[in-house]
Amino acid sequence: MSMKLVKRVPTGEEIKELYPLSQELKDIKAKRDEEIRKIFTGEDKRFIFIIGPCSADNEDAVCDYQNRLAKVAEQVKDKILVIPRIYTNKPRTTGDGYKGMLHQPDPNKASDMLEGLYAIRKMHIRAIKETGLTAADEMLYSENWQYVDDILSYVAIGARSVEDQQHRLTASGMDIPVGMKNPTSGDYTVMMNSCLAGQHPHTFLYSGWEAHTDGNPLTHCILRGALNKHGRSISNYHYEDLRLLYESYQKFNLVNHSCIVDANHNNSGKKFDEQPRIVKEVIHSRNYDPDIKELVKGVMVESYIEDGNQPVGGGCYGKSITDPCLGWEKTERLLKDCLLYTSDAADDLIGVD
């Protein structure tokens, strides 16, 4: 056979018993979840920043970054709510390359997914304990949800997973916001249908059980750019793209109309230095159009300690080993700039025509 079963993996409950969340951290998560929920329902008008490394490759570097981020998050909290990105599993276009801490707790060693499950849970818990900020992660594998359902405050479903039925149905059973990215083709209808599936109740097989869900009213869209037939990046963060999404929402029976704009990936053409400009243009569009302001709840930014990226084993602390990221100094400046840009009557500061 081409597939071999290597080792039994513990259930979510078994791993939670090994690495439990204290009552103090449970209370932090409950408070954070409520704050974030209110932004997606429109009760809280703050702007969301989902920000952090492309991939969480090293616990110490990631937690160092999160501690820096927490200090700035405190300074901007009146206008901006920060959700750290701690992405522990990575989709790979060709199947090659570093697939995240779940696969390789140590990027320089062989894959060990059991140790990876331990590692991602320990890192998420450490980050909450040190910073008081619960995080976002990508749901690359739908069955992984059972291992992190008590520690995450936001989940993204990627461009290659968004059409998958198991991802959609699993999202319908979550009680936190789930962002559905547009597929690599850029088709809004696929993304909207994913949101529709996520907001409806379902019965399906999950992790050896027949499961029933109630539907997730916080399922929403993420615009991340697209690829044309020649493999070139097409952005979809401009004003006309946001208007098109607003109009698309009117045609679907969805609640809590919301969008997050991913400032990297095909929106930037993976030119990480473009992210601050893209974020500011999105805020400009929000300030210009009340409909867009109501729709666009925030942005997603890839950021780490050092600018750019490096190969696995490159040896530079806090530098991405997957997609290039914005360095810390530029990240801090962006957040503080956006504190001004999201304030009342501040649009003239942005300088975007």
Per-region residue spans from a language model:
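Active-site-facing alpha/beta catalytic cores
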Residues: Q66, K79-L244, H265-K270, E274-E281, ...
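Metallocofactor- and cofactor-centric catalytic cores in central/energy metabolism, strongly enriched
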Residues: K29, E35, A56-D57, V62, ...
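Internal helix-turn-beta structural module
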Residues: Y304-L339
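Conserved small/polar residues in nucleotide/adenosyl-binding loops
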Residues: Y341-A346
